């Protein structure tokens, strides 16, 4: 199939710039004929006793670092305890061995790669990288979230290749994205546990603790796996032949207990509902002859129409970009024609798209 087969017209005003007033107050589109538009807090009406919801419990880290001099980096993947890959903007301003100081902590540019990718090393004093990021980093909101507030950046003093940053913050001269305290809460699922994602597994953002408690009370099970979402999730497909596209790799983990719960539910004929495309990709990557295997691994699975699914019966997901690998995935899962028609309906109904947008519940075709 061609990349253009997965294109559709999306009005820019439907790209959600902020979360809904409450997590569960977003809209939910049930993919039946005709589609049913409801509120997310009604999701329990479309599930039944014995269903198994599989969640991604990865926690978003504050992966965006302002280096001063109008330079930002977004961490991508952990390479070792102190070394990470990242994307820099603008990368042309950075050089190998540049050093950036945050109080008595240091970030060093160790390598420059193609397409703005770099490698960095953290030299920190008695704190972990995650503790450092919690203090100095920002939530890595997607690039399509563009707000009209002024950004802030730390005051920077440069001596040679060394830049010193302190906690006196001044506004950027330009306008663009900004993070708010609300984003620190709302761009994180309520059940997130394991730090490592640089983008949110967004289907889970709609769940509240109250909804999770109600699902449990109705006999609807829940279990958790981990996929650390990388920055590559936002990379566009640039080849017209979609099979020439190279997927990014991401770290996944399924515990023996989770694998046992999923396999038991499948054997008993219970419905498996994947909460998010990250969960579905992890399940399908781990599955062999219909059996989900426990373990930790990296996946670059690319799911397109024609893929034979072995795990989930239903998929809860947000609305995705035209021509994206995730729109290809849902076309594979719930039908190419059906998804184009469903998205036309969603656009007509002015549903909100992407990370802070609305959700849809799909059945496997």
From Swiss-Prot:
Major localization listed first in the record, in broad terms: cytoplasm
One GO molecular-function entry: S-adenosylmethionine:tRNA ribosyltransferase-isomerase activity
A GO cellular-component term linked to this record: cytoplasm
BP terms from Gene Ontology: queuosine biosynthetic process; tRNA wobble guanine modification
Subcellular localization: Cytoplasm
Catalyzed chemical reaction(s): 7-aminomethyl-7-carbaguanosine(34) in tRNA + S-adenosyl-L-methionine = epoxyqueuosine(34) in tRNA + adenine + L-methionine + 2 H(+)
Protein name in the entry: S-adenosylmethionine:tRNA ribosyltransferase-isomerase
Species, as recorded: Rickettsia conorii (strain ATCC VR-613 / Malish 7)
Lineage: Bacteria, Pseudomonadati, Pseudomonadota, Alphaproteobacteria, Rickettsiales
């Amino acid at each position: 199939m061609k990349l253009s087969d997965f294109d559709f017209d999306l009005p820019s005003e439907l790209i959600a710039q902020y979360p809904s007033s409450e997590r569960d107050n977003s809209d939910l589109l049930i993919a039946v004929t005709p589609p049913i538009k409801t509120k997310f807090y009604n999701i329990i009406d479309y599930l039944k006793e014995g269903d198994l919801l599989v969640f991604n419990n990865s926690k978003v880290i504050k992966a965006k670092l302002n280096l001063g001099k109008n330079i930002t980096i977004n961490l991508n993947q952990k390479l070792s305890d102190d070394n990470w890959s990242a994307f820099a903007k603008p990368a042309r301003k950075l050089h190998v061995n540049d050093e950036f100081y945050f109080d008595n902590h240091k970030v060093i540019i160790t390598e420059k790669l193609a397409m703005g990718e770099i490698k960095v090393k953290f030299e920190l004093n008695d704190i972990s990288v995650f503790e450092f990021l919690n203090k100095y980093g920002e939530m890595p909101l997607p690039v399509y979230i563009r707000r009209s507030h002024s950004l802030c950046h730390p005051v920077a003093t440069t001596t040679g290749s060394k830049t010193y940053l302190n906690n006196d913050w001044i506004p950027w001269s330009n306008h663009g994205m900004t993070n708010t305290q609300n984003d620190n809460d709302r761009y994180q699922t309520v059940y997130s546990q394991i730090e490592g994602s640089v983008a949110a597994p967004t289907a889970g953002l709609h769940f509240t603790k109250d909804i999770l408690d109600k699902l449990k009370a109705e006999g609807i099970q829940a279990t958790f796996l981990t996929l650390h979402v990388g920055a590559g999730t936002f990379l566009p497909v640039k080849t017209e032949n979609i099979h020439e596209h190279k997927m990014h790799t991401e770290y996944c983990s399924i515990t023996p207990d989770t694998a046992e719960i999923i396999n038991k539910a499948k054997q008993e004929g219970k419905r498996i509902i994947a909460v998010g495309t990250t969960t579905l990709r992890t399940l399908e990557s781990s599955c062999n002859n219909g059996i989900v295997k426990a373990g930790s691994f990296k996946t670059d699975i690319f799911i397109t129409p024609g893929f034979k699914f072995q795990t989930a019966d239903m998929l809860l997901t947000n609305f995705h970009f035209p021509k994206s690998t995730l729109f290809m995935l849902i076309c594979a899962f719930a039908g190419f024609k059906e998804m184009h028609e469903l998205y036309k309906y969603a656009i007509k109904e002015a549903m909100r798209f992407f990370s802070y947008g609305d959700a849809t519940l799909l059945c496997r075709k």
